[in-house]
Design a protein with these regions (language model features):
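Mid-to-C-terminal alpha-helical segments outside catalytic/metal-binding sites
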Residues: 55, 66-67, 71-78, 84-139
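Catalytic pocket-lining loop regions of alpha/beta-barrel enzymes
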Residues: 1-78, 125, 133-139
Length: 139
């Protein structure tokens, strides 16, 4: 909520935050944050906050990934994984490893362009020095 109330990104326009684990509770409270911005006469979140805040996909079940992609713009989502991570076991409900987060993203109905954004393009944009290094190596 401090991102909404303050002007951090006006003062530091190149500052970027990547909130791990799908943003935690952020997608669940998105309406609250939008309402707070409106109540405080702040610009919409996409203008005031989302140019600098990103979320990773390190979420351990399909409904969580689905919510993240329903709420957060595709340009603000980066692939993230802890594989082999904190929850290494096999989910008895699915038969797959809990921490195989790529399969949850793969299960989404994404265009090739959006899939590229999540797995590579957004990271290159968020980390321009990495992008320059990779381009320098022909990647």
């Amino acid at each position: 909520m401090q991102f909404i109330q303050g002007d951090l990104f006006s003062d530091f326009p190149e500052l970027r935050f990547i909130i791990p684990h799908g943003g935690g509770a952020v997608p669940y409270h998105w309406g609250r944050y939008r309402g707070l911005a409106d109540m405080l006469n702040r610009p919409p979140l996409r203008e005031h906050v989302m140019r600098n805040v990103y979320f990773d996909t390190c979420v351990y079940h399909q409904p969580g990934i689905d919510l993240l992609f329903d709420v957060i713009d595709i340009n603000n989502i980066l692939f993230g994984s802890e594989m082999v991570g904190a929850v290494r076991g096999i989910d008895p409900e699915t038969g797959f490893y809990f921490d195989d987060t790529k399969r949850y993203v793969d299960a989404l109905n994404l265009s090739d362009e959006d899939r590229y954004k999540v797995f590579e393009g957004n990271a290159r944009r968020v980390f321009p020095r990495l992008d320059a290094l990779l381009k320098g190596r022909g990647l």
